[in-house]
Curated annotation (Swiss-Prot):
Residues 39-107 form the KH type-2 domain. Keywords: Ribonucleoprotein, Ribosomal protein, RNA-binding, rRNA-binding. GO terms for biological process: translation. It comes from the Bacteria. SMART domains: KH. InterPro entries: KH_dom, KH_dom-like_a/b, KH_dom_type_2, KH_sf_prok-type, Ribosomal_S3_C_sf, Ribosomal_uS3_bac-typ, Ribosomal_uS3_C, Ribosomal_uS3_CS. Belongs to the universal ribosomal protein uS3 family. This is Small ribosomal subunit protein uS3. GO terms for molecular function: mRNA binding; rRNA binding; structural constituent of ribosome. GO terms for cellular component: cytosolic small ribosomal subunit. Binds the lower part of the 30S subunit head. Binds mRNA in the 70S ribosome, positioning it for translation. Residues 214-236 are annotated as: Disordered. Part of the 30S ribosomal subunit. Forms a tight complex with proteins S10 and S14.
Length: 236
């Protein structure tokens, strides 16, 4: 089962939490769910260059709070915050609610599964050899603290007549272990020969406590430790 299912969906409520966090009446649920899909599609299209990892949507009473996790927050914010204000106004019009927009920087894009998949897809579109792109991504992830990584590329790789699937793995990726903190991401490369799919699994260690927010808290703590160690180096 762990080999087939989306690893994030399998761990929801155990050591992962949902990206849409709100409750609704039966009559409103469908409308709000459709709104979430539209918000994500709009932001993904609008901020293609911003390296977006994930979009979290929360809905306090008659409000909407959107949190964008991005490796390039400067592109979203713009000069003196002009771009982020335009985005906020567009989102308010889409939701018909008072919308706030938060940006969270992804400090280690090399171990974020979605960003790795996007990077490989962009390289395939630029005709970089798929094996080289995969190997480079694996080496970067292992160097920056991942305990294991697996990458699948499928489609007409290198312009081959027959589509196939190639994969590369290093370290451990225990898909069946529920306490494993596994990040998963996908991307599509639109090449001259057709679409190639990229899937990435990153194993970041084990979470022993039963806490749906554990994975997020761990990422934030890791960022803080990284920034404090950088400050210590600068002071030295």
């Amino acid at each position: 089962m762990g080999q087939k299912i989306n690893p994030i969906g399998l761990r929801l409520g155990i050591n992962r939490t949902w990206d849409s966090r709100w409750y609704a009446n039966t009559g409103e649920y469908g409308k709000l769910l459709h709104e979430d899909v539209k918000i994500r599609e709009f932001l993904t299209e609008e901020l293609k260059q911003a390296a977006i990892s994930k979009i979290v949507i929360e809905r306090p009473h008659k409000k909407c709070r959107v949190t964008i996790h991005s490796a390039r927050p400067g592109i979203i914010i713009g000069k003196k915050g002009a771009d982020i204000e335009k985005l906020r106004k567009k989102l308010s019009e889409m939701t018909n609610a008072d919308t706030s927009l938060n940006i969270v920087e992804v400090r280690k894009p090399e171990i974020d599964a979605t960003l790795i998949a996007q990077s490989i897809a962009q390289q395939l579109e630029r005709r970089v050899a798929f094996r080289r792109a995969m190997k480079r991504a694996v080496q970067s992830a292992m160097r920056l603290g991942a305990e294991g990584i697996r990458i699948n590329c499928s489609g007409r790789l290198g312009g081959a007549e027959i589509a196939r699937m190639e994969w590369y793995r290093e370290g451990r990726v225990p898909l069946h272990t529920l306490r494993a903190d596994i990040d998963y991401g996908t991307a599509e490369a639109k090449t001259a020969y057709g679409i190639c799919g990229v899937k990435v699994w990153v194993f970041k260690g084990e979470i022993l406590e039963h806490d749906p927010m554990a994975s997020e808290r761990r990422a934030v703590e890791g960022d803080n430790q990284g920034s404090s160690s950088n400050r210590r180096r600068e002071n030295a």
